[in-house]
């Protein structure tokens, strides 16, 4: 989701906050933290599967933001995509260090969307546990693309930036993931 799609500050307001943050203005940095905290935490919680690690990685994400905000440039990607890229990289480092995913609890719903989408309807009809099992059968890259696209509503371009892939690769991963899920769901209904 781009900043203009959020029920929060506009892209221009985010830009001003980033510029003020780059000048070292503490209030602007705090505002950027408050605007992005819930989505970053939810993404990391969904990615690593437990609250403790998600909290640690969220803290590390915002620490990296503070350290690197001076290097951020508004060129091809919005600030939120840059911040999610930091979170994504930290989660990949976490996986390499721990070699496995350890879910321990339910993942919180990200804030923002109150309307039920087609994805929500499908999720309800299949059931939470069944859907989690289906998604778990996908590759890690496919899971990441679906999470960024359908949970966090990022565009293909933004997801590509976050995952350091081409837009075509993101479209391909999404397509293969959805085809795989569709085959699995169709197979389950036939039984």
Where are these regions (language model features)?
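Short helix-capping/turn signature of helix-turn-helix
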Residues: 34-38, 46-49, 136, 147-155
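Short, charged helix-capping/linker segments at alpha-helix termini
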Residues: 3-6, 20-31, 41-60, 167, ...
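Helix-turn-helix DNA-binding module
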Residues: 133-144, 152-169
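Internal acidic/polar
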Residues: 10-14, 101-128
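Short amphipathic alpha-helical boundary/capping segments
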Residues: 16-20, 130-138
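Structural recognition of an alpha-helix C-terminal capping motif at a helix-to-coil junction
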Residues: 56-63, 77-89
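Short, Lys/Arg-enriched C-terminal cap helix and immediately downstream tail that follows
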Residues: 44, 96, 138, 143, ...
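Arg/Lys-rich amphipathic alpha helix in sigma70-family domain 2
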Residues: 67-74, 85-105
């Amino acid at each position: 989701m781009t900043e203009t799609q959020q029920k929060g500050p506009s892209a221009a307001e985010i830009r001003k906050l980033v510029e003020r943050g780059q000048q070292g203005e503490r209030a602007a940095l705090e505002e950027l933290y408050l605007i992005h905290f819930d989505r970053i935490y939810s993404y990391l919680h969904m990615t690593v599967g437990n609250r403790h690690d998600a909290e640690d990685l969220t803290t590390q994400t915002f620490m990296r933001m503070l350290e690197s905000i001076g290097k951020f440039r508004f060129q091809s990607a919005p600030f939120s995509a840059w911040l999610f890229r930091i979170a994504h990289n930290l989660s990949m480092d976490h996986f390499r260090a721990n070699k496995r995913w350890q879910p321990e609890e339910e993942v919180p719903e990200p804030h923002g969307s109150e309307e039920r989408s087609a994805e929500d309807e499908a999720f309800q009809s299949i059931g939470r546990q069944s859907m989690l099992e289906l998604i778990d059968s996908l590759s890690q890259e496919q899971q990441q693309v679906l999470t960024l696209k359908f949970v966090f509503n990022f565009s293909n371009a933004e997801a590509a930036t976050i995952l350091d892939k081409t837009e075509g690769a993101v479209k391909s991963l999404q397509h293969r993931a959805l085809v795989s899920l569709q085959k699995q769901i169709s197979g389950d209904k036939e039984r």
